[in-house]
Amino acid sequence: MPFLDRIQRWATERPHGTAVAIAGRRLSWAELRGRAAAMVPETKSVTTLCEANSIDFAVKFAAAVAGGRQCAVLDPAWPAQLQEDIVRRVQSSAEPAVVATDDPLADGPPGSTFLIGLTSGTTSVPKAFTRSRRSWQESFEASIEFFGLRQDDVTLAPGPLAASLNLYGLAECLYAGSEFQTLEHFDVGDVHAAVTHDRVTRLVLVPTMLRMLSERGLTGCVDASGIRTIICAGSKLDARTLEAARRWAPNATIYEYYGASELSFVSGTGLSASQPPAVGSTCIGRPFPGAEVCILDDAGQPVPDGGYGNICVRSGMVSNGYLWGDDGEALRSFGDWHTVGDQGYLGPDGLHILGRRADMILTSGRNVYPHEVELALCAVPGVSAAIAAGMPDDLRGQKVVAGVVPSHGGITATQLRSALEDILARDKRPLQYFVLAELPVTDRGKVSRNLLLEWIAHRDPRVESLGS
């Protein structure tokens, strides 16, 4: 693992400095080194780590990747039967390296596997992919440069360490010699307290968390002027979240990036406090340092300039591929170019993300990506959240419909149609609008377009037609 040699360095240079702080407990660099090194002799060649956020998690993770060891991080919130299934799969599928009880707390060979990552698939069992130590070392170098991570930063990633965004944030800080903080569980009040009292200068989180923290922070007069950097991933920042974040943390540069667990970083952009945002834009910036991006069709051929197709990346940050669950579609390669099937195009301003091909709406022979419609709707005053889908239609094949959650009071179809005239092309605008009491979300917490269509078909009380 590329951060273990760095832990040794920071423990020598700054033994009493804080390395990790979780739920009020702190570990200095010397303590982290000592506790992790003491665990290495009893740590097997392949570890499945399934723990809530804690100091012990950080120690065990460091020990679990010493030398040639490999680690799979499981979500403790998963059902016990699923956890047991994954543990069995890891133990039977992984190719363990030779390890010894006298191994030091040190990085293994750059090309060796250290991480067995788990990512949601179409089945109940997550897909598993593997990563080399070199891939994360290259990722660290790129992200530290792009996000401007400094040793005097204090990073707070309030989500679960089992999620790749937060696990990477921990490892990146250990590599950079910068303090990392998280919480036992996400709690708005606890995050606000950390921002106010624990010298936090940097937030790493998903857009839904940022919106909640910003809006409640503004209401509660929580001072976030000390935040220098906000890093978001997981979905595109909508206009309302961005506006609230800029008001709450007025001195922060807000970064968002596009990537995938299997690909690592692909593109990104940073918006300084003085820059105006691009309302409703699908652009997610320019290629990340060390990454090349192109758009290829399904045969692996370049599309015409500005054309839609598979977003493909070529870099040393890409994973090794799947350990299990490879359906031939989730991660595809065209020579040195790799894609997870996200669709987009390259414009003068950078890479534009349109979403997954499976979500595409085919209406009157035209392709419409609901992600683009949703971003435009979220930029409309009075809209708190939005979701678009393709409803079967005898005339068009499918027609674009949209549901919105109002931010306050009521909203009309006329208001929505008028607001989209200058943002979306005519053939991309919804033909029917619905007001929602809440977003349609699956049992796994994912927003579902199919569930929206089910609500509409069954006249669910959570959805009400606004007319055409």
Predicted regions and their residues:
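Conserved AMP-binding/adenylation subdomain of ANL enzymes
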Residues: 138-154, 162-202
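Conserved beta-loop-beta connector loops within the AMP-binding
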Residues: 292-313, 348, 409-413, 448
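Conserved AMP-binding/adenylate-forming core of the ANL superfamily
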Residues: 3, 8, 14-43, 83-84, ...
